[in-house]
């Protein structure tokens, strides 16, 4: 690579490091140079040093990272958070509150249409009105029961089929 290309690549790596680590550009450059411009190595070094309060006094001491997505929460803290959660039993026991009634009841304009069909009657599927021949293989809906279809809709369907 030419000198300009290397400088450009290094500048881009420094900028990416600053964005990823949230440190100053000069610190990013020092870490990247120390890691021979290996981005992951420099990033690991940065986060290991930032988690060790006195890294130059005790270089052999390693601390567990505490603020990373892969680190589980502190176990006692997690237990305390779970103990604050409530179950739905608390909602049922306090059903006199208006919020509990709203949460457990259907809305006032709720229409249970699915419960209106007769027990042995299955509502047929109505095919889409797109230009295909699928509707020729399906029976036409017969809801409500006992209602007969007039000749006009069948003539319209025949006319539509003739145009295809």
Swiss-Prot record:
Pfam families reported in the protein's UniProt record: UBA_8
Region ranges (Disordered): 144-164
Transmembrane intervals: none
Modified residues (N-acetylserine): 2
Keywords noted in UniProt: Acetylation
InterPro entries: UBA-like_sf, UBA_8, UBALD1/2
Annotated family: Belongs to the UBALD family.
UniProt name for this protein: UBA-like domain-containing protein 2
